[in-house]
Amino acid sequence: MIKANVILGHYKWQKKIKNPNNYFKNKLKKLSSFSYFKKKKYEFSILLTNNKQMKSLNYKFRKKNKTTDVLSFPFSYKFKKNSYLGDIAISYEIINKRANNSSFIKEFDKIWIHGYLHLLGYDHKKIKSFKKMKNKENLILNYFYKKN
């Protein structure tokens, strides 16, 4: 089972996701049944915040004085069956803006999955690793939204 510790850092999130803890509980239950994640006991924290705090975090940890959609802070890349993976932070304003012509939830899922994969060691520094990460994101998103 995969568990998320959800930290609601900005009130606007509840306009789109009424109960973030239940939302992640349901999504992660489904993700835990995805073949790659079966029999894994992973835990991570996710901060649902705003542009102001994201800009501050981005500067503090990456020395970039601008906001961003998602930041991931892996705890370790040595995974055991039971592992704390690390922390993710996501900006409400960026997700909301990108979702302007589509679904907020689908855009949010895309971004937190991207952050989650960073916790698992995926990156997009080179074309090959970018494609590998993008393929895994798409596999998970398709699994989430497949018709039963």
Language-model regions: role of each:
Residues M1-W112, L117-N148:
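An acidic/histidine-cluster motif and surrounding catalytic segment
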